[in-house]
Amino acid sequence: PPYHIIYMKIKEGFTLRDVCGEKVIIAEGLRNLNFSKLINLNESAAYIWNSLQEKEEFTDETIADLLCQEYEVDHATALADAQKLLAEWQEQGLVD
């Protein structure tokens, strides 16, 4: 089947914080009262999260491009990593 581009955006109400040297995403406000855990991010995921805050929407290609610009990684590897990260963020309810 043809490859379909899926546009996503980060849900409102989540903030990246530095907690005791760890990068974590936390839920803020009443909307997310049932959010019972912190989501840890490694350095590259935190870089991506911060970079995506400025974008209205993004795709796995957007993330792959960010990874290629910031780190010495080939596009195919970056795209695979981007797709894995987006799948995790979808599962955790961080992106639409």
Model-identified regions with their sequence ranges:
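Acidic, low-complexity/disordered tracts enriched in E/D and polar residues
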Residues: 2-47
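Long, charge-rich, low-complexity alpha-helical segments
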Residues: 3-6, 37-96
